[in-house]
Amino acid sequence: MTNIHPTAIIEPGAKIGRNVVIEPYVVIKSTVTLCDDVVVKSYAYIDGYTTIGRGTTIWPSAMIGNKPQDLKYQGEKTYVTIGENCEIREFAIITSSTFEGTTVSIGNNCLIMPWAHVAHNCTIGNHVVLSNHAQLAGHVVVEDYAIIGGMVGVHQFVRIGAHAMVGALSGVRRDVPPYTIGTGNPYQLGGINKVGLQRRQVGFEIRLALIKVFKKVYRSEDGFFEALLEAQEEYGHIPEVQNFIHFCRNPSKRGIERGAAKEAFQEESVDKEGALVES
């Protein structure tokens, strides 16, 4: 049963699904769609051609679907789509897109923490975490299972690869390869995200292959792209390695991140559970 508080303002034309909860002082504009089992908490504001997927919770004072913060925007019809079972926490801002027919898209099972900002034309995959005050500029792409730490700034058009983890306070100006971990401003890669991949039950042999490929590519004396070709010949049969190589060989206009910290090249050993550890 849908439960709408009498102080909520819901404009005629808004589409409200079944078992939706709308708390006090929420504002829902006329072109918004709330799918079944959505919860919108007090003072949230949802505008524009926005669709909120089933089971998603919008926390107090979040703002979704507002006019993009882009001077190029001239009132075109643009969209915001948020998937199922997401948590959009307090004061998060997800603006609409720029250019006719384009969409800001957030996948399923994402956590957008307080004060995070998702700008125009961003695309976020499934199971992504944006930590407190993470700031995505326009046209950023964040792939599945990536984690963006607190107070990170991501330059427009940058891509963050799947399963990457970007440490807090980082400034990211170039594409971050999948499966990597890093931090800093300027940003430096710290190697493969071993702990994250193990938690997601990525197999030992795959993790080890990714580590070897990363080291081959990032400390090669033959050149970055030449090393990618060598890695393709040796490990290209592994889908995760193939994804890493394809990502690095096809960067955005920002280019691929080449900086790597010294600790990224430490030798690896294995503990009694089969986990990779630094020696």
Curated annotation (Swiss-Prot):
Query: What Pfam families does the entry give?
Result: Acetyltransf_11 (PF13720), Hexapep (PF00132)
Reaction catalysed?
A: a (3R)-hydroxyacyl-[ACP] + UDP-N-acetyl-alpha-D-glucosamine = a UDP-3-O-[(3R)-3-hydroxyacyl]-N-acetyl-alpha-D-glucosamine + holo-[ACP]
Q: Where in the cell is it found?
A: Cytoplasm
Q: In which pathway does it act?
A: Glycolipid biosynthesis; lipid IV(A) biosynthesis; lipid IV(A) from (3R)-3-hydroxytetradecanoyl-[acyl-carrier-protein] and UDP-N-acetyl-alpha-D-glucosamine: step 1/6
- Broad class of where this protein is predominantly found: cytoplasm
Region annotated Disordered sits at: 260-279
One GO cellular component, as annotated: membrane
Decide whether keyword Amino-acid biosynthesis is in the record. Answer: no
What keywords were assigned to this record?
Acyltransferase, Cytoplasm, Lipid A biosynthesis, Lipid biosynthesis, Lipid metabolism, Repeat, Transferase
Show the SUPFAM superfamilies listed in the entry: Trimeric LpxA-like enzymes
| Assembly and interaction partners | Homotrimer.
State what protein this is by name. Answer: Acyl-[acyl-carrier-protein]--UDP-N-acetylglucosamine O-acyltransferase
Species of provenance: Chlamydia abortus (strain DSM 27085 / S26/3)
Please name the gene that encodes this protein. lpxA
